[in-house]
Amino acid sequence: MEALEKKLKVCEPDAYKLIVIDGVYSMLGDLAKLPEICDLCDKYGASVMIDDAHGLGVFGENGSGTASHFGLTDKVDLIMGTVSKSCGSLGGFIAGDHDVLNFIKHTSRSLIFSASMTPAATAAASKALDIMIEEPERREHLWDTTRYAWKCFRENGFDINLTESPIIPLMVRDTIKALSLVEEAYRKGVFITPVIAPAVPEKDVLIRFALMATHNRSHVDQAVEVLTKIFKEYGIIA
């Protein structure tokens, strides 16, 4: 927050200032400090835009995202997201003030030179949103499984950093080990993904363990058992 405030302080008071953040950070699974950021926006006359690719369907009322989770939807100027993750489709969206969206439609190069979503992708995304609203038990189940997974990994000595979401980083901090153990885990029935440089600094290489609403505690038990043995073999955990 200190670094952000320093930048805001040197901006011209009347200049337009837009703070662009992730709602949920895709590597470590932690959340943006949205309340503090919104306070700075009020203080310095800035606007805020959230890329909520990993918040939609998981956080907030009816899975409506990070801003809703913090009760700050009215404080956020633009919310951008994708329907390729929790919605299982293709495409994306941006929500905000009508005049701002009209401006984006006519000036955003990436939008101007892209094609519309196909009818099938649109229907799939629409149905997924209906399910999020009508079947909250799916999200409740996801969170039960997520909290259980946090507990299991920590009890077995894994470093899962500061995750606050179903994205669970398993810190490895070694590229060769990360790539090797991913292959070994796959052979033993556990699908995980490596995150290596340049996506993260070399010292922060990790394995991303991501949960879905269709996973349950028995899946977590199986995965933790397999990964604990492999991580011990590679000397990552004691």
Model-flagged regions — what are they?
Residues 1-50:
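Active-site phosphate-binding strand-loop segment of PLP-dependent enzymes
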Residues 43-44, 156, 188, 234:
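Helix C-cap/helix->beta junction micro-motif
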Residues 187-190, 199-238:
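PLP-dependent enzyme catalytic core of the Aspartate aminotransferase-like
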Residues 44-47, 54, 59-164:
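Active-site C-terminal subdomain of aminotransferase-like
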Residues 1-3, 23-28, 55-58, 111-112, ...:
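Short, small-residue-enriched loops and turns at beta-alpha junctions
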Residues 1, 13, 17-21, 60, ...:
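Pyridoxal 5′-phosphate
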Residues 140-149, 154-189, 199-204, 211-213:
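Conserved PLP-binding catalytic core of the aspartate aminotransferase-like
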